Amino acid sequence: MKVGVLALQGDVSEHIDAFTAALRKRGYTEDSPVIEVRNPEDLAGCAALAIPGGESTTISRLVDKNGLYKPIRDFKGGIFATCAGMILMATDVGDPRVHSLGLLDMTVDRNAFGRQRESFEADIRVQGLDGGSFHAVFIRGPVVTEARDGVVVLARTDKGIVAVEKGRHMALAFHPELGGDLRLHERFLKNLGV
């Protein structure tokens, strides 16, 4: 079992640490690495890919520049996308500068929570997540304004939808990798049969 983290921008090391801990918690050893993905060759053998937050227009440009657009679209593993990663997963982002992957049929509102100084933390209820509410860190995040074609809504705030999943993909407007709560990472891995 190998997990890749798109290492073009964002909190890459935090995603690596969170997925490493989640894999160990699920009984996987050092033989199940979490690696940085910078080019198409790095995706080989990965069962999952995390797309971190950052700035969505920049990440989409770097995905194109590094030849990763088609390989990620064709990737057969699961994708765990946070913040800007959620934007890249959507079919409709409302900004022509963002070359989205279009893997989840949904519309997102970029920066729905405002500027960086308006970042906040909140306890949210996530559908089907045992153990009570989830403490979520929102940093200038998006919201989903419309989910279509089997995209399942997992969580909402008063601003809109902040967590979705469909099949092997999960997209979150917040940053679960910044807290110690691994339940969403574990749920994602479990959905992949890991």
Curated annotation (Swiss-Prot):
Keyword check for Glycoprotein: no
Q: List the GO biological process terms.
A: glutamine catabolic process; pyridoxal phosphate biosynthetic process; pyridoxine metabolic process
Q: Which SUPFAM superfamilies would you find in this protein's record?
A: Class I glutamine amidotransferase-like (SSF52317)
GO MF: glutaminase activity; pyridoxal 5'-phosphate synthase (glutamine hydrolysing) activity
UniProt keyword annotation of Hydrolase present = yes
Sorted alphabetically, the keyword list is:
Glutamine amidotransferase, Hydrolase, Lyase, Pyridoxal phosphate
EC number(s) in its UniProt entry?
4.3.3.6, 3.5.1.2
Residues annotated as binding L-glutamine are: 54-56, 110, 139-140
**Cellular component terms (Gene Ontology):** cytosol; glutaminase complex
The family database entries (InterPro entries) matched by this protein are listed as: Class_I_gatase-like, PdxT/SNO, PdxT/SNO_CS
The annotated pathway is: Cofactor biosynthesis; pyridoxal 5'-phosphate biosynthesis
Record's NCBIfam families?
Answer: PLP_synth_Pdx2
- Subunit structure, as described in the record: In the presence of PdxS, forms a dodecamer of heterodimers. Only shows activity in the heterodimer.
The record's family statement is: Belongs to the glutaminase PdxT/SNO family.
What role does it play? Answer: Catalyzes the hydrolysis of glutamine to glutamate and ammonia as part of the biosynthesis of pyridoxal 5'-phosphate. The resulting ammonia molecule is channeled to the active site of PdxS.
UniProt protein name: Pyridoxal 5'-phosphate synthase subunit PdxT
Q: What organism is this sequence from?
A: Methanoregula boonei (strain DSM 21154 / JCM 14090 / 6A8)
